[in-house]
């Protein structure tokens, strides 16, 4: 079976998940950077979630991010807390 360039690119793309706040400047900035670089990602705006779900998420987040800083960028199961552009780009292989 022959694959197209797009199929190959999609296979190489890392799994990216963001935990963000809808009002967070740096959260928006990381989304724009990922969009500009052409990466697919999923995100959750915690402040827009129902209270019970948000509290459950925050209890998990506190385990590795006690200050509850945002954004949280998870690339292939590696969590980067805060907007650390250079580190994010290193993990994405674009630096």
Segments and roles (model prediction):
Residues 46-68, 86, 94:
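Thioredoxin-like thiol-disulfide oxidoreductase module
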Residues 13, 68-70:
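A general structural motif
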Residues 70-80:
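A short, hydrophobic beta-strand/beta-hairpin element that forms part of a small beta-sheet core
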């Amino acid at each position: 079976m022959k694959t197209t360039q797009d199929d190959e690119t999609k296979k190489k793309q890392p799994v990216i998940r963001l935990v963000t706040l809808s009002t967070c400047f740096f959260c928006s900035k990381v989304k724009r950077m990922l969009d500009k670089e052409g990466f697919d990602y999923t995100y959750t705006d915690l402040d827009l979630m129902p209270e019970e779900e948000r509290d459950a998420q925050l209890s998990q987040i506190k385990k590795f991010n006690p200050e509850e800083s945002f954004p949280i960028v998870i690339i292939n199961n590696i969590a980067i807390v805060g907007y650390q552009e250079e580190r994010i780009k290193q993990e994405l292989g674009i630096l």
